[in-house]
Amino acid sequence: MSRPSSRSTLYRLIEAGQLAHKALLQPLLERGLEPGDDAILFELGRAGTTEMELAAELGLSEVSLTTRLSRLLDRELVTRQAVGPELAPGIALTERGVRIRNGLADHWTQLEEALMGELKPKQRKKLGERLRRFVDLLRL
């Protein structure tokens, strides 16, 4: 059995994952946001929704989501408003929330391009498939 080595592909994958995670957190922390707030902003970027639907989509308890939403409401990133055809009480992004969400999405795209930029479309697809398979194996 081989010893773990800093030259191994797995080591580099772990290192890249940790550095990418840190790079994705940086713009959140600079804006006074917490890890996970971006998931809320991205989900609300699709459309306003009810708190119950948002909690279910993100896999959060309603109590946990309420705490996060209170902070985002205080920072004027989200607002309470009627959503959907039934005009149910819900939550949506403010203009400021949309700008911050777009900035975070742009940052994500830049990191993705740094990773995949030199690859041709078929190579990108194959890499994505291999990483997905590896993740699936690890989840067993």
Which residue ranges define each predicted feature?
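Short, locally clustered residues in the helix-turn-helix/winged-helix DNA-binding domain
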Residues: 14, 42-46, 105, 132
